[in-house]
Amino acid sequence: MVKVGILGAAGYTGGELIRLLINHPEAEIVFANSESNAGNLVAEVHEGLYGETDLKFTAEMPFDQVDVIFFCFGHGKSEAFLKEHNVPENVKIIDLAQDFRLAPETVVVTQQPTPAAHDFVYGLPEINESKIAVAQHVANPGCFATCIQLGLLPAAKMGLINSDVSVNAITGSTGAGQKPGATTHFSWRNNNM
């Protein structure tokens, strides 16, 4: 049984992860961390889990009781968390945010700075299964990257892609997480393409 800790468990990603893990035969959720919801039932925040679990959010982070922790923070918070907290080396980390998705040597101009150095392995099993299997730190790819890579991978393996590929992708309102922003509110995104 893999013992799991979830940080940032009250957000959309945390809720979906809890939903996937509560009935997983090989996983046990030891803690679901959310400082703002500590003491509340998970199902009070993630209403779709009502009747599925009696798990409560906690402000505690007992790393010594888990085998793996999932970072379900907003983008840009995972790196800061690792700088501020001492996670034992034997605890695996799977980051579901964007902080460690790109290799340190990748030069990308974005609104979010890429960490200067890290040892996270790109976590798309269809292309990186052997490295993920032995990795201590895994960076889960984003929804667009996953969709594009899984869609193109069969054609690429068969040598059918002979030129650049252009992708037009559209995201829903939940793609930016729960925290409101000027361009992420439903009223801004609704019927706005």
Regions found by a protein language model. Name each.
Residues 2-193:
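N-terminal Rossmann-like NAD(P) cofactor-binding subdomain of oxidoreductases
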